[in-house]
Amino acid sequence: MKTRTRKGAVGIGTLIVFIAMVLVAAVAAAVLINTSGYLQQKSQATGRETTQEVASGIKVERVVGKTDLPYTNIGSDSTELDYIRQLAIYVSPNAGSSGIDLSNTKVILSNGEKEAVLKYAGGPDDDYDAFTKGVQNDIFDLYFKYSSDGTNWNNEHSGLAAWKNLYYTGTNHDPAKNFGIIVIQDADNSLTEDYPTLNKGDLVVLTVLVGSLEEYTGNPSNDDNAVYETGGAKYDYIDVNGNSDTTDTIQGVFGEGIPAGTKITGEVVPEFGAPGVIEFTTPSTYTEAVMELQ
């Protein structure tokens, strides 16, 4: 009897297995390709973020403080310098840093007893931005002067918006929670009052009112020919006889200000990137109105 061969059946089975293996391999390859593509994109994004975090950041160039000015107003001859009331923090971007949005930057300050977190007093929805642009002959100028004709106050001089709009009535700002900006250098005009973006080559001063102000809120109709002006970091009302009076107090970050021999620490923290470090100890006595602290 003749024996039948089954080679054909075996060949078809092998072909089916082979096709199945090819299909499985194709599906696996597709999964691997998709996964590798996703991982590649994630790694690129992570790399960009890491580069941004490492390269970007803010550098604190220097910190300058201003004490109470000697009171040279009419009716006063005091020359005491008790507290630092204003801080000017000079900052620039790190080398290789991408643009830093100062409206999303925070300033952290601590005197060992209190820590404050400050944000920019301005933005597109703010009518009174604490923002000044251009080189100034006095970066601490918060000086106001009004004269009265018996009916109205006449504005003779206004201080820098970077200072006065931290506390000026109607701004809804709190000098104990906000900082201002003075633009010293900005070649590409990236620093605007609504969107202050710090780029390569830019230099700005962050203004912080660390001490209190005293404000006169009198009625000009009752103060004929009076003068209303600041005496350093205070508001003084000077009447026609040379007598001064002070009333309503505006609080700064550290109450009356920073006394002598006080250690201050803090950071200027951008939205991303390395923060700028603030650390200094004030002198044991204040002998000058303006002094470099860091």
From Swiss-Prot:
This protein's UniProt keywords: Archaeal flagellum
An example molecular function term from Gene Ontology annotations: structural molecule activity
Disulfide bridge map: none
A biological process from GO: archaeal or bacterial-type flagellum-dependent cell motility
Residues excised as propeptide: 1-8
InterPro entries: Flagellin/pilin_N_arc (IPR013373), Flagellin_arc (IPR002774)
Principal subcellular localisation of the protein: other
Compartments (UniProt record): Archaeal flagellum
Signal peptide range: none
GO cellular component, one term: archaeal-type flagellum
Domain of life according to the entry: Archaea
Magnesium as UniProt keyword: no
Sequence similarity: Belongs to the archaeal flagellin family.
Function summary: Flagellin is the subunit protein which polymerizes to form the filaments of archaeal flagella.
PANTHER family attached to this UniProt entry: FLAGELLIN B1
Name of the protein this chain belongs to: Flagellin B1
Encoding gene per record: flaB1
